[in-house]
Amino acid sequence: MTVTDIATRTYNHGWRLDPIVRSLLDTDFYKLLMLQMIREFYPNEHVTFSVINRSRHVRLAEAIDEGELRAQLDHARSIRFSKNELIWLAGNTFYGKTQMFSPDFIDWLATFRLGEYELRKVDGQYELHFHGPWTHTTMWEIPALAILNELRSRQVTKGQGRFALDVLYARAKAKLWAKVERLRKLDDLWLSDFGTRRRHGFLWQRWCVEAAKEGLGPAFTGTSNVLLAMDNDLEAIGTNAHELPMVAAALADDDTALRRAPYRILDQWRHTYGGNLLVALPDAFGTQAFLRDAPEWVADWTGFRPDSLPPIAAGEEIIKWWKQKSRDPREKLLVFSDGMDVDSIEETYHHFAGRVRVSFGWGTNLTNDFVGCSPDGTVDLDPISIVCKVTSVNGRPAVKLSDNPEKATGEPSEIERYLRVFGSAGRVRAPVHV
C-alpha cells in the first residue's frame, strides 16, 4: 500500500506535480465492458456526450480556470494504455471469467486515444461537449467529470495553508473512518467503491479505497475504478449504464421500435456477457415501464441496479415483479448505488435482510464527503451533482426520463414524446444532491 501525505501533495498542486488523469484505466470498469460491446455492435454511430451541471448555483466557469481545464483535458488526450495495463486487462479474471476482453479488443485499445473536445463559457457555466464515434466519446465521461471535480477542489484548497490542509484531511479521514466502523457491524455486507466520477481527487479516492479495504475486509468487494483495482489487487466492479438504452432509443425509427429499444440492446449485452454481469438498469425511461414491457428472459437475469427511486421503494417494486414472474427474490440481486451513504446503506440492508441479496455501490459520499471538515467553515468543498450524458446520436436528440424528473435530460419536445411512449407511472420528483 502506498502511503501518501495528501495535505502536502495538495499544498504542492500549484507546482503541477499531479496530473488529474494518470492513466486511461483511471475510469469505471463498466466503460470498458460497454466499449467492447459498442465496438462490436455500434462501431459507426456518431454520439455526442455533454457535461451537465445540475447544481446550477455553483458557477463552474467562475470556480475553475479555463486555462487549467484545457491543460488537464489536453493531458488526458495525450495518454495511451501502457503495455503492462493491457497485459493485466488481457490476463486478469473478472467476475470469475478469464479473457473477459478479446485479443482483438486488446489490440485495438493499444492505439486508443481520447478524441477532441468542444469547450466554451456560457453564463457562468462551462459547455463541454465530446463529438465523434461512440467508441471514443464514451471514454470521455469519467475523466471529464473527474477533472472538473478535482479542479474545483484544488481551487478551494489552493489558498489554504499547510496547517489548515492538515486539519481538513484529518477531519475528512476521521469522518470516513467513523462510517467504516458503523458499516463493519453489518454481517455479510457487500459494498464497493463507485466514487470515481465525482471524487474530491485521485489521491483522496485512493486513500478512501485503501481505508475501506483495511476497515471492511471481505465486505469491501472491490472498486469501479480499474486503475485502483489493478494497483490494490481488488475486483473491478461494474455492469452497464444509461447510455446503452439512451443510444438505442435515439436510433429507433418509430414509436414501436422506441418501446423495444431498451430490450434490444440488453439482448446484445447478454450475448456479449453473462453470469453476474446480467444486472439491468431499469430506470432510463421509468422502472414501471421497463418492468411492464420486459421480455420473460429479463426475469432470469442476476438482478437489477435501481438508480433514481428511493432504494426501499425501488427494491420492493422489483421484488413484487419477480414474484409475479414466479422467480424467487432470495436468489436474485439488487445493487443500490444512487446517493448511498452510511444511513441509507444500514436502513436498506436491514429492510431487505433475508428477502433478497443486496450489494451497495458507495459513490460520492465515500470519495467526496468534506461537509463540515474545512477549518474556515467554507461549503465550497461540498459535492455537486454533475453528469456527462449522451445528448445526440447521429444528429438525433437523446433522452433520459429517469424515475426522478429532476434527473431527466433531453429536449422538452423529445421528453414529451418519450413520455407518450413509455408513460409517466411511478416517476417521483425529488431533490438531487449528488
UniProtKB/Swiss-Prot annotation:
Its EC number is 6.3.4.21. Keywords: Ligase, Phosphoprotein, Pyridine nucleotide biosynthesis. One of its GO terms (cellular component) is cytosol. Transmembrane segments: none annotated. It comes from the Bacteria. The modification Phosphohistidine is found at H242. Transiently phosphorylated on a His residue during the reaction cycle. Phosphorylation strongly increases the affinity for substrates and increases the rate of nicotinate D-ribonucleotide production. Dephosphorylation regenerates the low-affinity form of the enzyme, leading to product release. One of its GO terms (molecular function) is nicotinate phosphoribosyltransferase activity. It is an enzyme of class 6 (ligase). It catalyses: nicotinate + 5-phospho-alpha-D-ribose 1-diphosphate + ATP + H2O = nicotinate beta-D-ribonucleotide + ADP + phosphate + diphosphate. Pathway: Cofactor biosynthesis; NAD(+) biosynthesis; nicotinate D-ribonucleotide from nicotinate: step 1/1. HAMAP family: NAPRTase (MF_00570). Catalyzes the synthesis of beta-nicotinate D-ribonucleotide from nicotinate and 5-phospho-D-ribose 1-phosphate at the expense of ATP. Belongs to the NAPRTase family. PANTHER family: NICOTINATE PHOSPHORIBOSYLTRANSFERASE. This is Nicotinate phosphoribosyltransferase. It comes from Nitrobacter hamburgensis (strain DSM 10229 / NCIMB 13809 / X14). The lineage of its organism: Bacteria, Pseudomonadati, Pseudomonadota, Alphaproteobacteria, Hyphomicrobiales. The gene is pncB.
